[in-house]
Amino acid sequence: MFNLIRKSTEWGGKTLVLESGKIARQANGAVVVTYGGTTVLSTVVAGKAKEPVDFLPLTVQFVAKSYAVGKIPGGFLKREGKPSDRETLISRLIDRSIRPLFPSGFYDEVSIVCNLLSYDTVTPPEVTALIGATAALAISGVPFNGMVVGARVGYLLSEDKYLLNASADEMLSSSLDLFLSGNKDSVLMVESEASELSESQMLGAISFGHQNCQEVIKLIEEFREESGILPFGFIPHDITSLVDDIASSYTESFSIAYSNIVKKERVLELEKLRDQVLSDMLAKYEQPNGNLQCQYSSQDIISALKSFERSLVRSKIIETSSRIDGRAFNGIRDIEIEIDVLPKTHGSALFTRGNTQALVVTALGTPQDEQIVDDLDGDRRENFLLHYNFPPYAVGESAALRAPGRREIGHGKLAWKAIRYVLPEKSDFPYTIRVVSEITESDGSSSMATVCGASLALMDTGVPIKAPVAGIAMGLIKEGEKFIILSDILGDEDHLGDMDFKVAGTSSGITALQMDMKISGISIEVIEKSLLQAKDGRMHILDKMNLVIQESRECIKNHAPRIESIFINKDKIRNVIGSGGKNIREICEKTGARVEIMQDGTVMIYAINNDAVEYAKNMIMDIVSEPEIGKVFDGTVIEIVKFGAFVSFLGGKRGLIHISEIKNEHINAVGSVISVNDKVKVLVIGIDREYVQLSMRRVDQETGEPIDGELYNIRKTNSDSDDSFLSSGSVNNRHGSEKKRRGSGRSRRSSGGSSYHRDDLHNNGFGNGNRSFNDNRNGNEVPRKPRFF
């Protein structure tokens, strides 16, 4: 029933298996790839384009379902919705890797779906999916020039060792995360983030990855041979004569238009010329009988015009060594930089390079603002967000605003990779950071303008980044064996060239790299020269940025939120929260701050100003602090009793001011001096296992300073000892007769027992006229553990 084809090999320490003929047999090509414990079903379906087009309508979708890791989706519907950012990014990786290998002029619809069936959270799914897409194309019959394989490369800096398809845990210690795709002869696509690695280290990673792809390329070739399926015949429509006809009539006009360095004017001139060419060529090639059939269709004319323009610009650059805007090959456009351009934002920068402009804005938030990512590798929280927006007006188009597309997600992720390494550790800067790049003008390299603008905006905000980051986009014009590398490419140079090579980094090294090809790959030699030329351009841009701001501001702006983190004993968390959240609510209501308590005892305090942060911090520290003898605290009288007053202090702790410690002179009734809810300053003069002894008379109630600056060295006693303050001995004594308790108390007083040394009292000036804490001058007995404690 099944015509099963199976091939396998060992690659990167794991088994790689290709299978077809059993699943999804209605597709033009379907391959199940299992690499380690990760399985992907890749399918290819091709058909005629629904409408005449002059481009390849290729659609690539990577789909990751929760069942692949044995999970049920969250939410009400319990079903996957729109593609996640990770699915979108992997789809782009596959698309960018295979698109250059379709033959020129092939405009049939091609749909590739890579469905993640099983995931071991170890083997990179993007590697498995690209292998599956290539193998499915190989047996689909769709014209496809060669095999392309992807590899994920890591780098252990301490060991100078490259890693192939390492697990997520292994990549934690890696200084590099690079995904590369290549065919037998060249590299097609690179996407990476790094921790300030040198050009030679990055080049070594690319070379290492490309070499390791060869084994799998050979396996796919053997797999295709065993299937016996060959690509169906494709003969592109010959439009050579049409290209020559356009060139003979319009070369001068287009040369003049492309010489205009003002993009807006250049675009308008080119649009008029294109409309004229289309009109003239349709009229010229219309059949004599007057029907609408032409020897060449409008799509043929558009394709021929694109081919003509591409050849015109490329030949001008190569023959005259002059670019569209007159710059040298390594020239950088004029740069203008402004920071702090928006008054009420937490940080902002306007970065303009030629006709490309990015307005980048930062916002600071609390850990509650972190992005919760529901990923197959496990839920995680992101405290750094970077969003890239590309509105239609940036290129002079009239169109409705839409949700971020694949391109915007991809460009934002590249800038995120470029910036992430230089951000401070969360323990040093606990804010959630959001950076938004609004592209207000675009003429090439808007993602790298975002990188520069983000670095400037972060420094303007006061985020202590390790170093400024700049980015540059490189281009390539390749004719035969001759090639020219262009620095800081324009949009037209990107469109008509062969490569878009983006490099971002600090003065010390590369933090992100992305390479896309429009031809079937480039050699390691071209990549090396591109990296070195990009370094010169990056340094030039960093110099321009340093003229405006060299390092982060010392502090965040006044209108930015304040966050402070403190650590408390985990056992004290319940005290801070309080019964039913009473304490934490009181803190938030009184201070206006927001307080977050982590399980490890980290307390995050968020407020709009420093005063509120300090107020909340002091309230929390009062709750978790322990009273110390000799320390003065603010307290509130909560109860008046015959023998003294009970005071609440340190966030709810209770202490007793004996009547003898209220004033230096004799008082008949406590209520004649203080009342409930009175605010008092008290000195801790004794600590028991359960009780705290307080004094008012020894503290200046105005200044809060101990009288005469004296600190009392009072002995901390055990609550069960005979001379312990408010000690009743055993539990049985507590429940004895009142007569017995009073007798016991008088016995202690007559024996001179005290909760502190009498010698200490004498030494501290209490020997003459000053009475001990147990003194009975007011005729009151010292209570033995009151029941309401």
UniProtKB/Swiss-Prot annotation:
Region: Disordered, residue numbers: 709-789
UniProt xrefs under Gene3D superfamilies: GHMP Kinase, N-terminal domain, K Homology domain, type 1, Nucleic acid-binding proteins
Biased composition regions of type Low complexity, renumbered to the chain: 763-780
Annotated binding of Mg(2+), by residue: D494, D500
Reactions that this protein is recorded to catalyse: RNA(n+1) + phosphate = RNA(n) + a ribonucleoside 5'-diphosphate
Gene Ontology CC annotation, any one: cytosol
Cell compartments where the protein resides: Cytoplasm
Cofactor: Mg(2+)
Record key words, sorted: Cytoplasm, Magnesium, Metal-binding, Nucleotidyltransferase, RNA-binding, Transferase
Residues in S1 motif domain copies: 630-697
Domain of life, source organism: Bacteria
One Gene Ontology MF term: magnesium ion binding
GO biological process, one term: RNA processing
UniProt-listed Enzyme Commission number(s): 2.7.7.8
Location (main, coarse): cytoplasm
Family statement drawn from the similarity comment of this UniProt entry: Belongs to the polyribonucleotide nucleotidyltransferase family.
HAMAP family on file: PNPase (MF_01595)
NCBIfam families in the cross-refs: polynuc_phos (TIGR03591), PRK11824.1 (NF008805)
The protein's name: Polyribonucleotide nucleotidyltransferase
Annotated organism of origin: Ehrlichia ruminantium (strain Welgevonden)
